[in-house]
A protein has these predicted regions:
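Conserved, aromatic- and glycine-enriched, well-ordered alpha/beta core segments
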Residues: 2-6, 13-69, 73
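A charged, amphipathic interaction segment
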Residues: 67-142
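Short amphipathic alpha-helical segments and their helix-coil junctions
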Residues: 1-3, 105-106
Length: 142
């Protein structure tokens, strides 16, 4: 499936791209377009006026989890981290958010969007595994 979003990926768009590939569409392809250039045959995310974007107090990652009925508690734990890294509104306690924000901002400064998505897939795989083990153990893994 063809997916589109805005250029200049940051944490929410990078997290959504990871979620799409890992849980929604393993064959996804990504393009980066202006808000007024969404192709009819593409699914847009994290763009103004589209279904898979910020709604109410939720970031796009949270919206996608709900839209695709993904109920994995680790994904919802990641959603809290992504939300705070993206919005910094203190809605959740997420110690990892500041570090994730810094890493994604730095990668945005040094990589084109397609490369950034590839690199951040590893970041989100690692964060997912860390939070999965933390939930299983009831504490941060060592």
């Amino acid at each position: 499936m063809r997916w589109v979003t805005r250029a200049g990926c940051h944490v929410d768009r990078a997290a959504c791209a990871w979620l799409i590939v890992r849980y929604i569409d393993a064959e996804a392809t990504f393009e980066f377009v202006d808000d007024d250039e969404i192709p009819e045959d593409a699914t847009a995310f994290d763009m103004v006026g589209v279904a898979l974007s910020h709604h109410g107090d939720n970031c796009s990652f949270e919206t996608m989890l709900g839209a695709y009925t993904l109920d994995d508690p680790v994904l919802w734990d990641l959603a809290r981290i992504v939300h705070e890294a993206d919005l910094a509104d203190d809605r959740y306690e997420a110690a990892e958010a500041a570090g994730l924000d810094a890493v994604c901002r730095g990668l945005t400064m040094t990589l084109p969007d397609h490369e950034l998505i590839g690199v951040t897939h590893h970041v989100f795989d690692g964060l997912y595994e860390y939070r999965r083990r933390a939930l299983l153990l009831g504490r941060d893994p060592s």
